């Protein structure tokens, strides 16, 4: 199916208008009736949603950004997505595609049309005895791996958010994770995509005649892709920059390594879409080559005297074939010591400057595992550890180690003061520069007053995450965060690193893409975007943004609401298990709406309060199953079901009191 290409001379949506006003909610949708009629000519009336509660519910993803869409479209098939693109182009509206909403850089929220592609795209098909899987964008990584487990295989990408992260986001953010590195990430394990371009053209890049079809349906685009490839490959400096940045984890900007790694416009396009964060096309289906599941593992948490000691050991540990090397700084160890089932190696001492490495080896046979463990244990014996460390194949010991590593984010986020927002950032540098980079980050935390910040991450890949909390209200706090960001950018780029390793450029790093790649490659990215999306309808402000303050615009403000839900980080882990997720609201959305209500009430916007209250009665209260399944999935231990029960009791008490008056 194709539609006429939009007139490239038509004005692009101005995505900067929203920088000043989207924190307000506003009772009425800003969409004109003509736009709604156009959308509903193909999409069912109930699936084009403009009520305030629907729009506010989708204003947040897992990041620290907040954008209220003008309408939410629940797409049921590929035709409806293509139609939404056409209507958006005809009426100068932006389109944000959303599935799991676990994005950490702001790429899953927008102020135009938000198209939910989770509900209608949940099919998957296993082929070749599990070696290949075709999967639609609304399926979670955990669901895919559960199907593949029957064949003792799994996806290469292993994001920590696998329970909620969906394939649409996995492709669009080039997801990797703790074990896959750059060898088994999305870019490396993908073998085909079915794409809907902004023009409405549908291309299956896995088809034998994909190049011919792309030339037939989009001749200018096909030729432009090859022209950009020649431009890149003929410039030795550009080739060197691309090779350096993509030698380690990198989700900054577009995947220009596609121009070096592939021939033919369809395959180049396919891999450019990987990591494009919904700015180039809709991924209607992805085909992955899967990898074997390791049957056996041995694990330890080794404590070093300081970060330098831990990071200095990395090259030798990588050389032993370690599957996982996870770094935790002193602040992380201090947090970990409070865990109920903390690893013994991090207990029994006062934390000063120590650092820890979670080291794990994988194998298919017991003999192979024993050999790897022997090599690893011998190396640890030669290193200067703060205290002795031993490997274990016991499930309880492995669970304890991983609870420590994976529980850090939740523990710090849960302990943050009410009303603050948690920011989880990630960067990557060459492994040999990791020690100095971590030391530099700690200095920046101290100089900017982020005393509670912690550093952890995938040390094997030179990829570290850091978590800090702040209350983004007032000029002083925004200036502090802006100053920290500028200094952090200088630190990472001076180490020849990448400003985003896993989480995507999003809105958080869009103003800094030019600084990482230089003017020439930034222009290549601009021309690529213009060639595929001439009207700029897909996710404007994400990846490319000339506004130097874009990263501090529309920052999420989390007012104090109710004690039971104040610690919510809006990660979305609760959503896949919620019985009402396809009927009304999810636990995350119930909390997002309560926060919007509290903010409106604080501003004296009682029309918004009344509008939200009216619809929350059914959407938020009556349709909640109150089975507390969300509690089991929530990393910070929020029981939204219990919270809704309290609201129901209060409503009941109010009715009883009015009867007896």
Protein language model regions, located:
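A glycine-rich phosphate-binding loop feature that marks nucleotide/adenosyl-phosphate handling sites
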Residues: 53-56, 104-106, 161-168, 252-255, ...
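C-terminal substrate-recognition/cap domain of FAD-linked oxidoreductases
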Residues: 50-52, 58, 258-266, 270-483, ...
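N-terminal glycine-rich flavin-associated loop
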Residues: 39, 63-95, 117-160, 171, ...
């Amino acid at each position: 199916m194709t539609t006429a290409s939009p007139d490239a001379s038509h004005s692009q949506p101005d995505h900067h208008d929203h920088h000043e006003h989207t924190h307000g909610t506003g009772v009425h949708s800003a969409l004109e009736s003509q736009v709604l009629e156009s959308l509903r000519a193909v999409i069912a009336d109930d699936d084009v949603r403009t009520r305030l509660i629907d729009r506010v519910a989708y204003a947040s993803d897992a990041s620290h950004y907040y954008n209220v869409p003008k309408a939410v479209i629940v797409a049921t098939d590929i035709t409806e997505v293509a139609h939404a693109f056409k209507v958006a182009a005809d009426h100068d509206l932006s389109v944000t595609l959303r599935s799991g909403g676990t994005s950490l850089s702001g790429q899953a929220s927008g102020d135009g049309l938000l198209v939910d592609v989770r509900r209608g795209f949940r099919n998957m098909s296993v082929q070749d005895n599990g070696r290949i899987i075709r999967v639609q964008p609304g399926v979670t990584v955990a669901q895919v791996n559960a199907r593949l487990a029957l064949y003792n295989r799994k996806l290469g990408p292993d994001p920590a958010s696998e329970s909620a992260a969906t394939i649409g986001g996995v492709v669009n953010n080039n997801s990797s994770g703790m074990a896959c590195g750059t060898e088994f990430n999305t870019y490396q394990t993908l073998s085909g995509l079915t794409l809907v371009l902004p023009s409405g053209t549908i291309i299956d890049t896995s088809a034998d005649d994909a190049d011919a079809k792309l030339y037939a349906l989009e001749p200018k685009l096909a030729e432009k892709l090859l022209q950009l490839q020649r431009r890149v490959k003929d410039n030795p400096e550009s080739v060197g920059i691309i090779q350096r940045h993509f030698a380690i984890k990198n989700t900054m900007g577009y995947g220009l390594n596609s121009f070096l790694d592939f021939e033919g416009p369809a395959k180049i396009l396919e891999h450019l879409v990987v990591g494009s964060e919904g700015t180039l096309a809709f991924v209607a289906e992805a085909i992955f080559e899967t990898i074997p599941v390791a049957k056996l593992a041995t694990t330890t948490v080794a404590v070093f005297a300081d970060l330098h000691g831990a990071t200095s050991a990395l090259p030798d540990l990588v050389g032993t074939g370690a599957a996982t090397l996870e770094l935790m700084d002193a602040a992380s160890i201090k947090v970990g010591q409070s865990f109920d089932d903390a690893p013994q190696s991090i207990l029994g001492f006062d934390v000063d400057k120590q650092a820890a490495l979670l080291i794990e080896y994988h194998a298919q046979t017991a003999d192979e595992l024993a050999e790897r463990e022997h090599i690893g244990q011998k190396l640890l014996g030669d290193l200067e550890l703060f205290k002795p460390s031993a490997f274990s194949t016991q499930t309880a010991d492995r669970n304890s180690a991983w609870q420590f590593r994976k529980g850090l984010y939740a523990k710090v986020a849960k302990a943050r003061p009410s009303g603050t927002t948690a920011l989880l950032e990630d960067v990557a540098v060459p492994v040999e520069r990791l020690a100095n980079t971590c030391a530099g980050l700690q200095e920046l935390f101290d100089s900017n007053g982020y005393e509670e910040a912690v550093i952890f991450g995938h040390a094997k890949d030179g990829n570290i995450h850091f978590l800090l909390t702040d209350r983004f209200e007032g000029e002083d706090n925004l200036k502090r965060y802006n100053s920290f960001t500028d200094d952090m950018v200088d630190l990472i780029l001076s180490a020849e690193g990448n400003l985003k390793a896993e989480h995507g450029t999003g809105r958080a790093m869009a103003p800094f893409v030019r600084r990482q790649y230089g003017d020439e490659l930034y222009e290549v990215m601009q021309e690529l975007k213009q060639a595929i999306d001439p009207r700029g309808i897909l996710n404007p402000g994400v990846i490319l943004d000339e506004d130097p303050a874009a990263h501090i615009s529309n920052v999420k403000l989390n007012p104090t609401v109710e004690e039971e839900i104040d610690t919510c980080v809006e990660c979305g882990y609760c959503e896949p298990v919620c019985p009402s997720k396809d009927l009304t609201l999810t636990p995350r959305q119930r909390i997002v709406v309560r926060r919007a209500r509290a903010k409106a009430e604080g501003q004296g916007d009682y029309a918004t309060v009344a509008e939200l209250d009216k619809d929350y009665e059914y959407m938020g209260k009556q349709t909640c199953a109150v089975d507390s399944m969300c509690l089991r999935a929530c990393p910070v231990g929020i029981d939204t079901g219990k919270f809704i029960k309290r609201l129901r009791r209060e409503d009941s008490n109010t009715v009883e009191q009015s009867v007896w008056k």
